[in-house]
Structures are given as structure tokens and as C-alpha cells.
């Protein structure tokens, strides 16, 4: 059956800056509002999670807000121009009620500009060799928040595991014979290196132990993590002591940083001219490990509950593929 498109179309772009748990119910609210509308219909609704927003290089429309946590694009149509305009404005109000902003495009050119970011979703795999494991998970829209939470749990665990893999590789490197540049001298390597290798190894091992504990205690109150590890914990001032470490991670109030916790301190330890080859070796290990990181990204077509769940991978990295397949098993259990 071919349907004639209504005469008037408005494209609404909604940017959400609060938590994903706060933002996702807006999808159901928009759907229900337009399903009940007498003369306006929802012709298209697309959802991008924050990983897609970052990957496509999304240019935020709201001034001074930073990168949104979620973006929705909606086409609303009607033969009644006043009705479609009012509906688009109401959708913007729904977004603002959930820590978001709404923007309306009227002309075909402006509408096309709004949709450009959606056409670049293949960029999610730009850090790999453009290979992805794709899953179409169909869930009730009312459960999207719960599903997103589950995916975020998987992503947080994958992120910490990748950092632990890096720590293990660095420990192995630092435990071996380090490449000291003797700068044309006859001094023994041990004398030139001093205690720097031991200090570096002890530092990496301490960070690894902290992240091991964190991975095993994601449901523990943040206060316990802070009490145990003090100033080494990267928690935002607005983080709540009684929330779980997972919740703080999910809502961007807690982070673990390879740059701040590992690579920067190692660069300070190995800061001498004799250490350039050591730093080069550390950098290669870091780059190789980061290349193998696995994450799950979500976007959704049409607001119909068909959630495209994508895992970018390098097809030549067997370990990365195995990690991705284990994640798929968890995703399938979550969906069921």
C-alpha cells in the first residue's frame, strides 16, 4: 500500500544532557502523544546514544551544553500546518522537561541538515577496520531505559577490563629488560636505570589492584571506594556517596583514566633523556591495547523498538572477536 505523504513536515531534533535513564522515557512520550493526535503523525523517529553522538562528530545545537548524552530526530507530518507546528513545539517541551533541548527545522534544506548526522553512523567503527557485529534487538519501548542500563553495565565492565589488560601488558614489559639509551657512555644499564623500573612497576601494579577491586565491586556504594582509595578516585563533586559505583559511572560522575592514572605518571618516572626508548615501548603497548577495546553502541530506527546494537571490532584480532562474542551472549540474555 502506498500512502501519500501529508503536505507539511517538521523535523525536530532533541538533545538530552541529563542521565540516559531520565532521557529515554521521552521516546515513549513522543510516540504516545502522536498516536493520540487527531491530525499529526510520526513519520520517522531515530535515536542515537552518546557513543554514536561522539562517533559522528555531532555538532551540538544547544549553546554551552557540551555533548548530549542522547539525540532524537523526529519527522512529524500533517496536512494541517498549524497543527504540525504546534505538535513540533510540544515535542520540544517534552524534551525540555527531561533535561533536553528541542530544535525545529521547517525548510527542506534545514531538515536535510538535521538528518546529516544520522547518515554518518558508520563512523562508529572508524577505530577498527570497519567491521561490526550487528544485532537487531526488538524490545518494548517502555523497556528501553532498562535495556540501555544493561548495555551500559556491559560497556563499563569492558572498559575496565581493557584497562586491566593494559596494566598486565605494562607489568610484563616493566618486569623485563628495559631499553636504556646509554647516550654514548660506558655506564652499566642498571646504574643508568636506577630504581625507576621498580617504581614504575609498583605504580602500575597498585593501579591494577585498584581497578581489579572496582570491577568486582561495581554495586558497592561509592563511599566504600573513596574510603579505600582516597585521592586516587576520580569522582565528580556532584557524585553521591550512597550511590553505587556503577550508577556513578553510568551518569558520568565517576571515571577511570589510563592517561591520568597510568601513562602520565609513567612519563614522569621515565622523564630522562636515557628513557626515550622505554617511553616509546610503553606507547606502543598502550596503542595496541586501545585498538583492541570493545564497546557496544545503540541506535534505533523509527521508534519501533528495533534497537540496532553494534559492536565494532577488528576482524584480524582474535581476542577482540572473542570478547565481542561473549558480550553478544550477555546482550541476548539481557534482551530476553
Q: Which role fits each region the language model picked out?
A:
Residues 1-336:
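Noncatalytic alpha-helical scaffold of FAD-dependent oxidoreductases
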